């Protein structure tokens, strides 16, 4: 049976339908807003795999080219590996739903969102978030939803839910929020140096906006009436648990206070091995359970120490930032470079400047576009003392890179003022928490070192949360273990003036306004401290670019002169690039960017282009080349492709019988423009130029 519900979200209608398509899935919905439609399915296997120790949730998101009326641009003309945008959307869907499955549910579960129709004004990513929740709600999966997503913008001080493409162009923030009826579950987005208070208002505006969508999902689940699977809590061997605590607790109390990550992990591993060995005979085959109880001990001890004593694993209080060191210009051939170290997290970041040829081509549902600023984040296994087989960047690397890219994008100069393609690469060389925020800091430093005129330096910080009942502690600059053992990972980046990017993920049922407000305020204090440390090395962009970076000079020509610059079959522009070695980019407005690392070559190219587009001016002197001798005079080229006639009467002050007595083809001759007729024909005089001095 087909069931349909509708919800109004700030003037837009969202329709969710189930029972018509993909009926063999555990749950399936078609969600629609405007002309955007997404099919979302959820399937969970009937049982878990033998020995499964974690919840294997997979989320896939795919944009079908036909959804935008396009044929894929690849060689095979079909959809291939996920684009960065598709990967990022997978993460948007995954992060708010993952914490809402019960402990003990270890069945393979897959959520698939397929965009089958798309317009520019209704974001399929937002509909996919809602659709994933709705598909799980109508399935038998033990999902503690619903959740809903919304994008919030702000134009002229007014918040907008799910803004159109045109509204987003004018918006000073773009934030995606996922929420339940009671609380915020996830936040991600960027802002143009917006204050913490304004961000908080935007987030809770979004929370209010999704309430009708949540109600519609509950209504749909009630209509469908699929009973949920009953998941029994794992049976705990209380005797074994008590024995593990008796043997390991005192040692673990000391181990979790070891400040250095490697030494701490070695100590915990040693305690685990000793405990497993001590209980092996009495509790045969209990190694996995013992390790689980040790992990539980670590979880409880770390959290208790923070809540009761206000002291963290490495001895810091909740607000202290780890020691920071920074260095720039460490890579002599890079256009800009920085080494950023915070505690045991470290990144080498390099900035490279390019021209329009280096722009990234994006093939999307809505057509081709070009990307002028890119940030690529790499997380090699050695950064955490591990080995692995590395191929393409994973979802995490793409997500962290995009967060840092958004943070820095807000302070870039306008492209008209700084017409370069910019690529930032962050290679994480050590990691113990907050490597994406180290990338933001290092990226800011490397751009200043490269001489990119950014509006202001940007720093980032990762905040954590430990919540026990009504008590909670917010942690500044979290360690990797605090991220793992805590309840929230809240990354905030920005300048001294305001926030440029943020991302929040939680592992509990949601966070309140009080917690979010406190976290944002504490993050601001930490960010200001980090900016101060960065300023000790470099406080503003250098006044000049690296000697190895291309210099781009912009000139303008009249639109009707573009064809003269290009020439037949590109002959003219090719002759300029071959003669000078520069790179030239021309757009249809008459804007020409000339790029070269050699100033003399750039100047010569400009001169050649000026000659190609120059127009004769009456009364002006020109040094020309004789192109053709006629009985009545000589044709002299004063610019490439532009010549004029020197009539025989204008050759000399004396009467000239034969033109060839004065001029020969190929001669250089100084002439003066004495007129231009209505047809544009140029009249030149050698006679009037005699005795005059020519300067270019």
Swiss-Prot record:
Residue stretches making up the S1 motif domain: 619-687
Reaction equation(s) it catalyzes: RNA(n+1) + phosphate = RNA(n) + a ribonucleoside 5'-diphosphate
Cellular localization per UniProt: Cytoplasm
GO-annotated biological processes: mRNA catabolic process; RNA processing
Alphabetized UniProt keyword annotations: Cytoplasm, Magnesium, Metal-binding, Nucleotidyltransferase, RNA-binding, Transferase
Chief location of this protein within or outside the cell: cytoplasm
InterPro entries: ExoRNase_PH_dom1, ExoRNase_PH_dom2, ExoRNase_PH_dom2_sf, KH_dom, KH_dom_type_1, KH_dom_type_1_sf, NA-bd_OB-fold, PNPase
Cofactor(s) of this protein: Mg(2+)
Identification of the protein by name: Polyribonucleotide nucleotidyltransferase
């Amino acid at each position: 049976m087909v069931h349909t519900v509708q919800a109004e979200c700030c003037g837009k209608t969202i329709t969710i339908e189930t029972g018509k398509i993909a009926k063999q899935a555990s749950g399936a919905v078609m969600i629609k807003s405007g002309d955007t439609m997404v099919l979302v399915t959820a399937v969970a296997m009937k049982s878990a795999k033998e020995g499964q120790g974690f919840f294997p949730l997979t989320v896939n998101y795919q944009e079908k080219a036909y959804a935008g009326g396009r044929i894929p641009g690849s060689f095979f003309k079909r959809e291939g590996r996920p684009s960065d945008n598709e990967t990022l959307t997978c993460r948007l869907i995954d992060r708010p739903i993952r914490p809402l499955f019960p402990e003990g549910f270890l069945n393979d579960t897959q959520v698939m969102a397929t965009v089958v129709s798309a317009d520019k004004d209704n974001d399929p990513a937002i509909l996919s978030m809602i659709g994933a929740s709705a598909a799980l709600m109508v399935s038998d999966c033990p999902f503690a939803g619903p959740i809903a997503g919304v994008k919030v913008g702000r134009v002229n001080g007014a918040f907008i839910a799910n803004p159109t493409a045109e509204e987003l162009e004018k918006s000073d923030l773009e934030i995606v929020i996922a929420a339940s009826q009671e609380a915020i579950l996830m936040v991600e987005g960027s802002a143009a140096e917006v204050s913490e208070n304004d961000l908080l208002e935007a987030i809770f505006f979004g929370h209010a906006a999704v309430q009708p969508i949540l109600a519609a999902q509950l209504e749909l689940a009630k209509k469908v009436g699929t009973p949920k699977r009953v998941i029994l809590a794992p049976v705990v061997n209380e005797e074994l648990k008590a024995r593990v605590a008796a043997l390991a607790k005192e040692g673990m109390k000391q181990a979790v206070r070891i400040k250095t990550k490697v030494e701490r992990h070695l100590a915990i591993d040693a305690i685990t091995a000793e405990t497993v060995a001590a209980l092996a005979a009495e509790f045969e085959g209990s190694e996995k359970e013992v390790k689980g109880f040790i992990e539980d001990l670590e979880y409880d001890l770390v959290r208790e120490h923070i809540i009761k004593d206000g002291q963290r694993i490495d001895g810091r209080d909740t607000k202290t930032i780890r020691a920071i060191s920074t260095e720039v210009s460490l890579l002599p051939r890079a256009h800009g470079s920085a080494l950023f170290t915070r505690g045991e997290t470290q990144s080498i970041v390099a900035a490279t400047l390019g021209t329009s040829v280096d722009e990234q081509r994006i093939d999307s549902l809505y057509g081709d576009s070009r990307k002028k600023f890119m940030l690529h984040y790499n997380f090699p296994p050695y950064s955490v003392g591990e080995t692995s087989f590395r191929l393409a960047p994973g979802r995490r690397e793409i997500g962290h890179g995009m967060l840092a890219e958004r943070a820095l994008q807000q302070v870039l100069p306008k492209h008209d003022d700084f017409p370069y393609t910019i690529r930032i690469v962050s290679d994480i060389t050590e990691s113990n928490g907050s490597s994406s925020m180290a990338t933001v800091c290092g990226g800011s430093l490397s751009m200043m070192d490269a001489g990119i005129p950014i509006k202001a330096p940007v720093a980032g910080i990762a905040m954590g949360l430990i919540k026990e009942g009504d008590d909670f502690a917010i942690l500044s600059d979290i360690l990797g273990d605090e991220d793992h053992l805590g309840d929230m990972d809240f990354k905030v980046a920005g300048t001294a003036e305001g926030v440029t990017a943020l991302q929040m993920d939680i592992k509990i049922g949601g966070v309140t306004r009080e917690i979010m407000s406190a976290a944002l305020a504490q993050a601001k204090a930490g960010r200001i401290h980090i900016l101060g440390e960065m300023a000790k090395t470099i406080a503003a962009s250098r006044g000049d670019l690296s000697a190895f970076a291309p210099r781009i000079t912009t000139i303008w020509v009249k639109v009707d002169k573009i064809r003269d610059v290009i020439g037949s079959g590109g002959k003219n522009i090719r002759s300029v690039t071959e003669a000078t070695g520069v790179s030239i980019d021309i757009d249809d407005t008459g804007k020409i960017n000339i790029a070269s690392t050699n100033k003399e070559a750039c100047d010569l190219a400009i001169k050649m282009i000026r000659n190609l587009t120059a127009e004769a001016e009456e009364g002006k002197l020109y040094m020309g080349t004789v192109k053709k001798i006629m009985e009545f005079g000589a044709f002299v080229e004063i610019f490439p492709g532009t010549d004029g006639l020197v009539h025989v009467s204008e050759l000399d002050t004396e009467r000239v019988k034969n033109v060839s007595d004065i001029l020969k083809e190929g001669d250089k001759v100084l002439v003066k423009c004495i007129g231009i007729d209505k047809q544009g024909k140029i009249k030149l005089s050698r006679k009037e130029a005699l005795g005059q001095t020519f300067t270019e």
